[in-house]
């Protein structure tokens, strides 16, 4: 079929030469053309099967490679979707961790503020208690020294009951 198409095509190309009215009787164009067509036909006859099988194998290789690439593309798209999903989950988890850390930091701050406040109050109470104790101690020492001075001076006489009453009133 191909050979017939070639011959027809060749004749169509030669038809303008025939219509010009040139004298081509002295040329061997027809013999050369027939030899060329015969050569192409024989070449086609012997190489057509090999050429077809070669082209088929190449097209099969190309289609296999295309299928492999499409499979890889599909896997890549699935991996991309999976990784994007994991990224979103990681972002949500990070936001949750940050919010929990902020809450925990606030709670720890409140705890330490409360503990510090209690410690300060305890220190104030303890210092007041120590001051009261020191005041009582100083009063007692003062009263004792005054009584001692009064007893040693012997200008004033006290009995034991009077000393007890004075001490009860002052301390």
UniProtKB/Swiss-Prot annotation:
Q: What is its main location?
A: membrane
Q: Which residues form a coiled coil?
A: none
Question: What Gene Ontology molecular-function terms does this entry list?
Answer: proton-transporting ATP synthase activity, rotational mechanism
Q: Which UniProt keywords apply?
A: ATP synthesis, Cell inner membrane, Cell membrane, CF(0), Hydrogen ion transport, Ion transport, Membrane, Transmembrane, Transmembrane helix, Transport
Xref: NCBIfam families: PRK08475.1
Q: How does it assemble?
A: F-type ATPases have 2 components, F(1) - the catalytic core - and F(0) - the membrane proton channel. F(1) has five subunits: alpha(3), beta(3), gamma(1), delta(1), epsilon(1). F(0) has three main subunits: a(1), b(2) and c(10-14). The alpha and beta chains form an alternating ring which encloses part of the gamma chain. F(1) is attached to F(0) by a central stalk formed by the gamma and epsilon chains, while a peripheral stalk is formed by the delta and b chains.
Q: What is this protein called?
A: ATP synthase subunit b
Indicate how the chain sits in the lipid bilayer.
Single-pass membrane protein
The family database entries (CDD domains) matched by this protein are listed as: ATP-synt_Fo_b (cd06503)
The superkingdom listed in its UniProt entry is Bacteria
User: What is one term from the GO cellular component aspect held by the record?
Assistant: proton-transporting ATP synthase complex
- Function, in words: F(1)F(0) ATP synthase produces ATP from ADP in the presence of a proton or sodium gradient. F-type ATPases consist of two structural domains, F(1) containing the extramembraneous catalytic core and F(0) containing the membrane proton channel, linked together by a central stalk and a peripheral stalk. During catalysis, ATP synthesis in the catalytic domain of F(1) is coupled via a rotary mechanism of the central stalk subunits to proton translocation. Component of the F(0) channel, it forms part of the peripheral stalk, linking F(1) to F(0).
Which cell locations does it reside in? Answer: Cell inner membrane
Q: In the UniProt record, what gene is named as encoding this protein? A: atpF
UniProt family annotation: Belongs to the ATPase B chain family.
Q: Does the keyword Cell membrane apply?
A: yes
Transmembrane regions listed in the UniProt entry: 2-22
């Amino acid at each position: 079929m191909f050979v017939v198409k070639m011959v027809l095509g060749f004749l169509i190309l030669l038809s303008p030469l025939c219509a010009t009215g040139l004298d081509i009787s002295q040329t061997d164009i027809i013999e050369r053309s027939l030899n060329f067509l015969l050569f192409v036909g024989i070449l086609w006859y012997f190489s057509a099967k090999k050429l077809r099988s070669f082209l088929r194998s190449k097209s099969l290789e190309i289609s296999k490679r295309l299928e492999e690439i499409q499979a890889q593309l599909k896997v890549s798209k699935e991996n991309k979707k999976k990784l994007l999903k994991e990224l979103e989950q990681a972002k949500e988890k990070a936001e949750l961790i940050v919010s929990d850390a902020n809450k925990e930091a606030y709670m720890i701050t409140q705890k330490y503020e409360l503990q510090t406040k209690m410690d300060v109050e305890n220190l104030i109470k303890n210092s007041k208690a120590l001051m009261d104790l020191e005041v009582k101690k100083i009063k007692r020492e003062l009263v004792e020294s005054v009584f001692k001075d009064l007893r040693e001076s012997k200008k004033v006489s006290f009995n034991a009951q009077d000393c007890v009453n004075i001490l009860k009133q002052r301390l």
